[in-house]
């Protein structure tokens, strides 16, 4: 149905259509009423739109007022007839009543009527207007329950009264003896009634036992949304535009909703209530009600605003963030406590896809993810704020995790599942790292800070896993110097065989960590080999001896590199470590040695003069001055940066 204007709903008045009758005429009219029972109905039929067959009752009036229509003939109704019609709810009486009011005003302006008589007549008119007002506002108070035609009649009456108010205001104050009765402001009264109806609807509470704020908020939101949708769909097509029916209802419901939430916000709220209050204010109300598909076109431009003032929202958000931080901290601490208890009780870790597995990383990731999702369910901005909070809490937790793990490494060595739990915790680092890299999107320096404790945990775990192997290799490496490098190939074969038999112990590590552990083992083999070369127990005075040793070193270097690479070591950076030392030992020209040393120092910036001296000591045919000149080349590289991967800094000489 198209929206009708107030002019469409009310037929124009005819001048002088309802002359005032004296009480004597009214009495006479009563006596004649039986003979002219259809006279009043004939007068009212002019206010009924459309044509009806005789005897057909209108849907907009009581059945006892529906009589046969006989055109426009018949005398105007008296005051008593108007009163009776209004008491029966016949809103058609509004037009004759308005004519009666105008006739009274005209009589007062013309003079000739006593002041007492004017007061008497006006009191009767005002009494009729009270009846009419109550009838009209009664219909408008329950507009969805009224038949559409009757609702249109009530709206037409209010629209007509508003026009009359404007005309009276334009005419200015009169000089007659009548009391001022305009403006009547029925439109304002209707709006007040809308506010009362909204308060009544929103004031209803959910079923008993559901008085918690969460249920009350849901009731308020659902009531407002459903009622406003009904206003848009069923009332807006019937109401004149000047009523602003959607705005009137929306503002009233909004004000009641806001008042209730403001009252709730004054109390000390629990965490759940604070969250639900923010969720409604910042998300559900603006998105699910104001911007709902059926209402967005009507409400978006009204400027209803927020349910709470910005300052109060900020205070609630600060409370929410503080509570969430405390909850996250407590939950993470509890998860770590349970995990550490399982270590101490020698509970074996789970196996997942052939790897030792711990649920700790998953628990922590879920705790932080749920906190962030909870904040983002309010606003994305609050999600960003809690992310900054979590970036403080998470590193603190990881440091606690590292400390707890270190304690376990020291105290749990005799436990049956010690190594399995160490592996499970190393594997945890992968889940933590992947989660941070994929979900946190923080600068690299921040990410490095976050991952720092995990790196320490992993490193200590590797040291623990490799400790027994290192002990087994120690006497094998000493054979190099004990035999004065008489059988270096056979010695290295024993070392490689020992390592090979122990590698299955690390099979339950995640693939990336097996590679890292293999790199650590690769580094250990190269480092220990260099240590044996640097012992100073081997001095070769001839070029042939030096070339023979260099050949042994090259062969051993190739064996180490091939074995470690074959088992997953990614440490290509270690490849030149031993071959270049072999070349320094093989070369006889001090200048050539000097160039080789300079190149070596660029690969390994932690290669110091002390390390160089230990290697040059093998070459017994170099003079002190030649050694000094060769060593001087390292002075040029003194400004080099610290190596990102240490090698020679792990080797003590002197």
UniProtKB/Swiss-Prot annotation:
GO terms for cellular component: exocyst; extracellular space. Residues 28-38 have a biased composition (Basic residues). Keywords: Angiogenesis, Developmental protein, Differentiation. GO terms for molecular function: SNARE binding. InterPro entries: EXOC3/Sec6, EXOC3/Sec6_C. Induction: By TNF and other pro-inflammatory factors. The keyword Ion transport does not apply. Residues 1-38, 50-78 are annotated as: Disordered. Pfam families: Sec6. GO terms for biological process: angiogenesis; cell differentiation; exocyst localization; exocytosis. PANTHER family: EXOCYST COMPLEX COMPONENT SEC6-RELATED, TUMOR NECROSIS FACTOR ALPHA-INDUCED PROTEIN 2. Belongs to the SEC6 family. May play a role as a mediator of inflammation and angiogenesis. This is Tumor necrosis factor alpha-induced protein 2. The gene is TNFAIP2.
């Amino acid at each position: 149905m198209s929206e009708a204007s107030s002019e469409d709903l009310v037929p124009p008045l005819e001048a002088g259509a309802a002359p005032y009758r004296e009480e004597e005429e009214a009495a006479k009219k009563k006596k004649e009423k039986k003979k002219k029972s259809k006279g009043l109905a004939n007068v009212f039929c002019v206010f009924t739109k459309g044509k009806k067959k005789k005897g057909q009752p209108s849907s907009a009036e009581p059945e006892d007022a529906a009589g046969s229509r006989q055109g426009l003939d018949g005398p105007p109704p008296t005051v008593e007839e108007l009163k009776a019609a209004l008491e029966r709810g016949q809103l058609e009486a509004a037009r004759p009543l308005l004519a009666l009011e105008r006739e009274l005003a005209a009589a007062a302006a013309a003079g000739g009527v006593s002041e007492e008589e004017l007061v008497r007549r006006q009191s009767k008119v005002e009494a009729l207007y009270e009846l009419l007002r109550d009838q009209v506002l009664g219909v408008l108070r329950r507009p969805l329950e009224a038949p559409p035609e009757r609702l249109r009649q009530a709206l037409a009456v209010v629209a007509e009264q508003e026009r009359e108010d404007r005309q009276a205001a334009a005419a200015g104050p009169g000089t007659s003896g009548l009391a001022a009765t305009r403006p009547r402001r029925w439109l304002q009264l209707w709006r007040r009634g809308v506010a009362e109806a909204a308060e009544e609807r929103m004031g209803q509470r959910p079923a008993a036992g559901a008085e918690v704020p969460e249920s009350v908020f849901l009731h308020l939101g659902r009531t407002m949304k459903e009622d406003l949708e009904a206003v848009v769909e069923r009332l807006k097509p019937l109401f004149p535009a000047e009523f602003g029916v959607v705005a009137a209802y929306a503002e009233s419901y909004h004000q009641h909703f806001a008042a209730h939430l403001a009252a709730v916000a004054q109390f000390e709220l629990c965490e759940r209530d604070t969250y639900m209050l923010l969720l409604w204010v910042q998300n559900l109300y603006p998105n699910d009600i104001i911007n709902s598909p059926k209402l967005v076109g009507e409400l978006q431009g009204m400027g209803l605003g927020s349910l709470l003032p910005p300052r109060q929202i900020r205070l609630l958000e600060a409370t929410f963030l503080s509570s969430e931080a405390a909850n996250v901290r407590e939950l993470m601490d509890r998860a770590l406590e349970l995990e550490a208890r399982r270590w101490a009780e020698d509970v074996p870790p789970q196996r997942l896809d052939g790897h030792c597995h711990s649920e700790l990383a998953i628990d922590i990731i879920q705790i932080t993810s749920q906190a962030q999702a909870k904040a983002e369910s309010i606003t994305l901005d609050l999600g960003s704020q809690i992310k900054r909070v979590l970036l403080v809490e998470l590193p603190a937790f990881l440091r606690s995790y590292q400390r707890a793990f270190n304690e376990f490494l020291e105290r749990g060595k005799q436990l049956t599942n010690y190594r399995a739990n160490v592996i499970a915790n190393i594997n945890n680092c992968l889940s933590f790292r992947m989660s941070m890299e994929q979900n946190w999107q923080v600068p690299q320096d921040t990410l490095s800070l976050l991952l720092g404790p995990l790196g320490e945990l992993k490193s200590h775990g590797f040291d623990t896993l490799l400790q027994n192997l290192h002990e087994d290799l120690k006497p094998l490496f000493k054979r190099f110097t004990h035999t004065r490098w008489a059988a270096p190939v056979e010695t290295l074969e024993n070392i490689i065989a020992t390592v090979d038999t122990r590698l299955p112990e690390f099979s339950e590590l995640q693939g990336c960590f097996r590679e890292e552990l293999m790199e650590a083992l690769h580094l250990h083999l190269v480092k220990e080999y260099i240590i044996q070369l640097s012992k100073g127990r081997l001095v070769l005075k001839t070029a042939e001896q030096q070339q023979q040793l260099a050949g042994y070193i090259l062969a051993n270097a190739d064996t180490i590199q091939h074995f470690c690479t074959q088992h997953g070591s990614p440490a290509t950076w270690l490849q030149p470590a031993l071959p270049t030392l072999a070349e320094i030992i093989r070369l006889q020209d001090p200048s050539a040695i000097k160039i080789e040393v300079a190149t070596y120092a660029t690969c390994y910036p932690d290669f110091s003069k002390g390390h160089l001296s230990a290697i040059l000591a093998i070459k017994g045919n170099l003079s002190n001055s030649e050694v000094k000149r060769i060593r001087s080349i390292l002075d040029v590289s003194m400004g080099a940066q610290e190596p990102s991967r240490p090698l020679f800094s792990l080797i003590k000489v002197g």
